[in-house]
Amino acid sequence: YGLDTHLDMMVTVSDLKRMADYDLAVLSAHGAYYTYEYGWLWKKQATAPIILLLEKSDFWNDLRYGLELLSHRVIKVNGCYAVTGDFFGNAYRGGKLNGTIVLSETCEFYGRSGHVDTALSDGLLSGGAKAVAGFVNNVYSVYSRSMLWATVNRMIEGETLQQAIDY
C-alpha cells in the first residue's frame, strides 16, 4: 500500500485528457450547475453541471480546443474554459480511463436539489472510470477536504470506495 501523488494547481483542458495515467483522480475545482447559450442563428440554452478551470481563453487555445468548443464539450465562462460531462465521454471513449477512480470536490457535480444531473459522472463512467463520487449542491471546502482525506486514507488501507464512503 502507499500513495504517489502529483499535484497540478493550474489544470488545463489538455490536462483533463491525461487522467487515465492515474489510479485515483481528484477534481478540486469550482463547479456549477450552469445554464449557457449556444448557436449562432437560432439561440438555444442548455443547463448542465460543469467543472470550471482557471485556463484563460485566447486565440491559440480556442484553435487547439476548437472541436470541443464547437460541440459544447468545452464552454467559456467569464473568459475561462469549463468542461461538461460530454467532454469526458469523448476524451476517454472506448474505456480509456481504464479503471481510474474519480473523486470530485466541485460544487454541484451532481446538480442541485430538485435538479440532480449525472452528466459529469455519466461521461466519466462511459469513459471507463471504475467509480465516481461527488456532491449535489454547494459544498464547503473544509468539509469536502476532510471527506476526501478520510476516503483516500481508508482506500490506502485496502477498503473499496464504497466501504470508505460508508465509514
Give the label of every model feature segment:
Residues 1-37:
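Functional beta-strand-loop-alpha-helix junction segments that form "active/interaction loops"
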Residues 10, 57, 136-137:
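Proline- and acidic/polar-enriched loop/turn elements at helix boundaries
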Residues 32-41, 140, 145-148:
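Generic preference for flexible, low-structure residues
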Residues 34-131:
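Cysteine protease catalytic core and zymogen-processing segment of caspase-like enzymes
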Residues 101-167:
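Active-site-proximal C-terminal subdomain of hydrolase catalytic domains
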